[in-house]
């Protein structure tokens, strides 16, 4: 049997609940254990129901052998229950869990990371929000939105009043504390968290692989996670508006200018400082050059400042990486693999966004907008936070889903959001309602952004890694610009930041073109 199989784990939960009261543990001990098992059985069914709808409800461990040892099929073939009944069942388990679990566990040094009353209530809120969404609620039954709001608001109140949870981060520019929150195993933002360790011993290690995957190859990371042009161009400008709606000018080449503070903690790009433990001034360089000027015009992949060969994007995902990540050696691979950074499956920002969405769904626009502003205020926005005071109805719901896409980017939440809101195409009119482009058609094609050396700068026809046009350390340095004097540090003071931006602007304008790399057919087209 697959030890990670969902039905095997449901059986394990059922065996526990069937037998726990037969032991000699105290009632207090039994209740704490029951609360945790009710939660995890609910979690298993939550994943099943949100994926398949109705599934068989099995509340007690099945016995495949009856009497003489023959299999009694009538006890095993459990019919599929309705989605309604399954949602009710999961909510009952979560209510049971919430009634038995503490708001905060005693002795945090031993128990931190265990599920809590607030975590159970937050998962119930997430499930009921899913159930109120168009995937399961084609008729837009307002009663479901009411139930989702009640559950999510109750979770928010429990977590902030009794659970010692809060939105983490001062309102300083460029979201420095927001970045650090993701790698702090004791963060008060965490509601449901997976803890890892940085142990190297195979017998005891439980490492988070994200850091190794996200870091570039030149520092012996896994190669980096390429950010798409669609995501880079989607992030708000500094005024909170989409680039297409902002009063600030958006230059696709200088995509880093005047962006939402979270942009600088979500992406890493040419010329930006991306520190780790043993190199606090490490600067990303991942532009691309070609065999010669003709190849550059044709857009044929060439060489990268990062490493030989084609690259899918000059922009990496930075989010959830640790500025103090330990790099054991620049001479061997896997040096970031011993990461102990946690993963937050549910955090306070999601709970707040769930409250906002459910409030909007039930028609309470004022509450929805208030909670939506909480998300932006904690990263430095003030006043209207980029939202019109008259935002309401479908337009407000569209803004909430947009904020989810930004705040929760690269946290594994977008797929379910697209499913529950039927954003694949506009068959059910949700895309038109929300004012978003359907995912189908050309939207399924994801494009990389390659920053390529301008063709007119080529003075020879060499293509090797030692012919880097901007690196004085290269043996055949072209001398057109010196990149070693450039580093855009998101932690810099405001005055230094402005000077660094101006220097980077000059480098981009004089040396680089933005090239669209089509991930479907492998072509690169200059823009």
PLM-predicted stretches and their roles:
Residues 1, 55, 59, 95, ...:
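An aromatic- and glycine-enriched ligand-binding surface/loop that stacks and positions planar moieties
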Residues 1-53, 74-88, 92-110, 251-257, ...:
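Conserved, well-structured interaction surfaces
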Residues 256-375:
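C-terminal substrate/ligand-recognition segments
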Residues 462-527:
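Extended, compositionally biased alpha-helical segments that mediate assembly or anchoring
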């Amino acid at each position: 049997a697959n030890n990670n199989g969902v039905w095997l784990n449901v059986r394990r939960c059922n065996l526990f609940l069937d037998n726990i009261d037969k032991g000699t543990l105290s009632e207090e001990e039994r209740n704490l254990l029951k609360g945790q098992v009710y939660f995890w059985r609910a979690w298993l069914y939550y994943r099943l129901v949100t994926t398949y709808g109705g599934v068989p409800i099995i509340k007690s461990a099945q016995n495949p052998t009856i009497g003489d040892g023959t299999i009694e099929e009538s006890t095993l073939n459990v019919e599929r229950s309705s989605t309604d009944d399954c949602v009710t069942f999961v909510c009952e388990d979560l209510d049971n869990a919430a009634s038995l679990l503490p708001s905060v566990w005693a002795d945090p040094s031993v128990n931190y990371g265990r599920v809590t009353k607030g975590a159970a209530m937050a998962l119930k809120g997430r499930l009921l929000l899913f159930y109120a969404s168009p995937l399961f609620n084609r008729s837009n039954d307002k009663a479901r939105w009411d139930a989702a709001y009640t559950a999510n608001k109750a979770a928010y109140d429990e977590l902030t009043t009794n659970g010692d949870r809060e939105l983490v981060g001062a309102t300083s520019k460029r979201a420095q504390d927001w970045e650090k929150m993701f790698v702090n195993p004791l963060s008060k933002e965490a509601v449901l968290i997976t803890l890892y360790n940085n142990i190297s011993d195979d017998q005891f290690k439980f490492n988070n692989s994200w850091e190794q995957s996200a870091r570039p190859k030149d520092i012996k990371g896994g190669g980096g996670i390429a950010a798409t042009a669609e995501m880079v161009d989607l992030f708000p400008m500094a005024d909170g508006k989409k680039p297409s709606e902002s009063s600030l000018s958006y230059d696709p080449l200088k995509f880093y200018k005047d962006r939402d503070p979270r942009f600088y903690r979500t992406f890493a790009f040419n010329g930006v400082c991306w520190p780790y433990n043993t190199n606090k001034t490490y600067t990303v360089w991942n532009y691309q050059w070609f065999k010669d000027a003709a190849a550059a015009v044709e857009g044929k992949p060439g060489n990268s400042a990062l490493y030989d060969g084609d690259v899918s994007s000059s922009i990496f995902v930075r989010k959830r990486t640790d500025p103090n990540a330990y790099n054991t050696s620049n001479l061997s691979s896997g040096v970031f693999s011993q990461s102990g950074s946690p993963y937050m499956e549910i955090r306070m920002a999601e709970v707040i966004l769930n409250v906002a969405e459910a409030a909007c769904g039930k028609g309470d626009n004022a509450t929805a907008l208030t909670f939506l502003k909480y998300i932006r205020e904690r990263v430095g926005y003030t006043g209207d936070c980029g939202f019109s005071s008259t935002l309401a109805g479908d337009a407000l719901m569209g803004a909430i889903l947009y904020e989810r896409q930004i705040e929760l980017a690269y946290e594994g939440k977008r797929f379910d959001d697209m499913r529950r809101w039927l954003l694949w195409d506009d068959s059910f009119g949700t895309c038109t309602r929300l004012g978003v482009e359907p995912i189908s058609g050309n939207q399924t094609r994801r494009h990389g952004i390659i920053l390529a050396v301008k063709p007119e700068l080529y003075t020879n026809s060499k293509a090797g890694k030692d012919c880097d046009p901007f690196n004085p350390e290269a043996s055949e340095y072209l001398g057109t610009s010196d990149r070693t004097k450039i580093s855009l540090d998101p932690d810099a003071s405001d005055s230094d930041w402005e000077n660094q931006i101006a220097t980077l602007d000059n480098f981009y304008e004089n040396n680089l073109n933005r090239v669209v790399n089509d991930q479907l057919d492998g072509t690169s087209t200059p823009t």
